[in-house]
């Protein structure tokens, strides 16, 4: 066994060891290993106000060049330590190729692989205001299993044929939830009087019993969580 704090003295200001004193302060936490177990992906708020995502070479004890950061948003939740759903593995290449994250506008995937990043950007351009998740692909990276969901659409699983640049729907999610029964949800944001940018999602009732309908404000769990656009059943 190897203590991470001893292996990475450079992160002494934001240690991996969790204490009541640093839980809401500066600390680091692991997300998961690469397939060779020599690289550890982790999140840290060392020398910054938000959690970024990084990679540690366990053989050298040094960080790699990987750094995914956002000045205003936490890209990982300390409560999700070692939940590997955030890491995307390539079963063919047997390595981590991306990280799922809640981007400023829409949830997306930060790909380390340029080829997969190009596919992601192509799909997002063709499906604006949608959450696009590439789930699987074949060895030649010709056929991709993709999940697309909209602002108030539970979405569908699709096959993307890369050469033909075509999406083929294969299965709907919650097909009983048709547009006729769904309430419309849209993201919003505004500058508060203190100058801080606030954002959220507003749901408009389809058939309100009171006009205008009352407003119910629901705050997300904190302190790191935040509401993001996309379907919420």
How would you describe each model-predicted region?
Residues 218-221:
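Structural cue for short, hydrophobic secondary-structure segments
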Residues 1-199, 203-212, 223-233:
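Peripheral, non-catalytic segments that deliver or gate enzyme domains
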